[in-house]
Amino acid sequence: MAGASLGARFYRQIKRHPGIIPMIGLICLGMGSAALYLLRLALRSPDVCWDRKNNPEPWNRLSPNDQYKFLAVSTDYKKLKKDRPDF
């Protein structure tokens, strides 16, 4: 057991205790969902600036009908009018 690799020990534990398979599946699903949500926040959020030289204020380039929220229940972004100045 001391020389066994991590994968072999993991497989042995799953073989001995098959009840932990759903728990491992749910943990993997949760970790995958969290990683995808962080990726979405990093790529779609107007507050994140990856290139400070070419685009120092990315939130100024958003038009009023750009939906950047994850879920907008009562707002129809297609009908909004522009109410701010251009920079």
Swiss-Prot record:
**Record gene name:** NDUFA4L2
Q: Which family does it belong to?
A: Belongs to the complex I NDUFA4 subunit family.
Which InterPro entries does this one have?
Answer: B12D (IPR010530)
Q: Which Pfam families match?
A: B12D
Name of the molecule in the record: NADH dehydrogenase [ubiquinone] 1 alpha subcomplex subunit 4-like 2
Its cellular-component GO annotations read: mitochondrion; respiratory chain complex IV
Which superkingdom does the taxonomy of this entry point to? Eukaryota
